[in-house]
């Protein structure tokens, strides 16, 4: 089941639990606006290349639309649509005043030079500048984009609208980016994990973890687990997977990776088959990489007691059912990986106020938002007798539905 089908299915289940009327349910699914633009740029060799850019603006009942821009060869309108819809529910679960959006350009960023990427980003911004803005739609980095991409968007947008630091988040610090943004998703994942473990009388200290993915989110999660006395006993990325039953030395592994070393070449670990990573014995499994990695083939063999969805849509619905029957508790992506968008919101607030926070305040506020969301999700689980995924979806959908009705948009 693809991301769009799974997101729509979760939404419909939540709508049924909430007793939404069919007209309102239908209107909440339909995107506010879908944008498709053609971006032609001169390449460094003088030839012209054309790319298709998308932006799906799903819902703005609760505030400006918010979501990343990804550069990837397989950017597909259906996937962008699903991710935009997911952002609507995610921002509502996090109780930040945004709706949902997502965008992307179908390109292979690794095959374009820095100057070609800059030209492409600026042309894309020129095509959509009058449809985004601090109080309309606020993009952010995603797969294949970064703070430099956001700096180019900010600069190009400002040529039309004057200095507008709040038009994008995930910017470099020197252009109004927030301290703590780099670690935000990984740190949020660990605040969510702490909240869940505490509910079961456990803590990070003394628990064992397996992490799939060692990019930004996975490496921050591993670092924080290590600092808090937990053991990362297995870890994998695209280069391979490794394990150490006594716990990997995360600072040494980070140093090895930052010096260009592959995971499988790390001295203090045993190389393992990557297909065994997700079914490795552990207390907590954290998928931080791709969607759909937990499916009906491997779900019966999962040995973790808790799964924290740091990636988007890592568990397909069939795996969800199998894992539920096994008694595995899943903390859903819509909540678990919301640290990034929460700190993006803090960045936007700081830009609008023109008053920057220190990192301690950012982390303190993030902790508060993650804890509050968990308590609200638990309350929904109790009210509707459902699991954490449905608790989060009913919380998000209910907040958007209420805002929609209050605005008088339901007709």
UniProtKB/Swiss-Prot annotation:
Gene3D superfamilies per the UniProt record, alphabetical: Leucine Dehydrogenase, chain A, domain 1, NAD(P)-binding Rossmann-like Domain
Descriptive protein name: Glutamate dehydrogenase 2, mitochondrial
Enzyme Commission number, as recorded: 1.4.1.3
SMART domains linked to this entry: ELFV_dehydrog
Major subcellular site: mitochondrion
GO BP annotations, alphabetical order: cellular response to nitrogen starvation; glutamate catabolic process; response to alkaline pH; response to cold; response to nitrogen compound; response to salt stress
GO cellular component: mitochondrion
UniProt keyword terms in alphabetical order: Mitochondrion, NAD, NADP, Oxidoreductase, Transit peptide
Localization (cell): Mitochondrion
Catalytic reaction annotation: L-glutamate + NAD(+) + H2O = 2-oxoglutarate + NH4(+) + NADH + H(+); L-glutamate + NADP(+) + H2O = 2-oxoglutarate + NH4(+) + NADPH + H(+)
Single GO molecular function: glutamate dehydrogenase (NADP+) activity
Induction, as annotated: Slightly induced by NH(4)Cl and NH(4)NO(3). Induced in shoots after nitrogen (N-deprivation) deprivation. In roots, first transiently repressed but later induced by N-deprivation. Induced by alkali stress. Up-regulated by salt stress in old leaves. Activated by IDD10 in the presence of NH(4)+ ions. Induced by cold stress (i.e. 10 degrees Celsius).
PANTHER family the UniProt entry points to: GLUTAMATE DEHYDROGENASE, NAD-SPECIFIC GLUTAMATE DEHYDROGENASE
Tissues and organs where the protein is expressed, per its UniProt entry: Expressed in roots. Expressed ubiquitously in various tissues.
Presequence positions on this chain: 1-18
Active site, per annotation: 102
Family: Belongs to the Glu/Leu/Phe/Val dehydrogenases family.
Domain of life: Eukaryota
Organism annotation: Oryza sativa subsp. japonica (Rice)
